[in-house]
């Protein structure tokens, strides 16, 4: 297999003719607090407080507290709802991968807790700074029949940038054509 920065050849396999992507929309998700399960994967429970959706293919808002991110330090595992500007409710099931690029930690240690109190932790990064990481989401959508049902028939891929203070993530999504 020969490879350069511009091309990758796979002997015996056909190239995917006409494969391209087109910007579809962006989503900002805002979070208030994170509950971290103290395990090797550092699984979190993080409900979205809300957010916005904008772009050429979809506009609206993230329904506050409509789901949660149950991700780990390396994976996305979130479900939440979007309310489109026409009032349609769209279910989002987001999976994907993320990797911290600077070797830093994701969370600061929470204060000591008493039995029955949930462990809460916050971002380890300074306020109002992008978190240096690579995020690759691949969401699935369940939308009602009508102007948004294209979401259920389209492969969507994206990238994201996490920010601290306020704690939020900005997702940018593309439809695979």
Model-inferred region functions:
Residues 2-177:
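Beta-strand-enriched cores of mature, soluble protein domains
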């Amino acid at each position: 297999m020969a490879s350069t920065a511009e091309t990758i050849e796979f002997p015996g396999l056909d190239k995917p003719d006409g494969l391209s992507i087109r910007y579809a929309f962006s989503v900002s998700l805002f979070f208030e607090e994170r509950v971290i399960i103290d395990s090797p994967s550092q699984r979190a429970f993080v409900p979205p407080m809300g957010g916005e959706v904008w772009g050429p293919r979809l506009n609206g808002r993230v329904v506050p507290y409509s789901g949660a991110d149950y991700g780990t330090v390396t994976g996305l595992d979130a479900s939440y709802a979007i309310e489109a500007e026409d009032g349609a409710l769209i279910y989002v099931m987001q999976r994907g991968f993320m990797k911290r690029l600077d070797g830093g930690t994701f969370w600061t240690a929470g204060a000591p807790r008493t039995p029955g109190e949930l462990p809460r932790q916050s971002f380890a990064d300074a306020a109002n700074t992008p978190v240096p990481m690579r995020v690759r989401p691949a969401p699935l959508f369940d939308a009602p029949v009508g102007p948004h049902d294209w979401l259920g028939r389209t492969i969507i891929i994206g990238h994201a940038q996490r920010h601290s203070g306020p704690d939020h993530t900005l997702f940018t999504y593309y439809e695979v054509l």
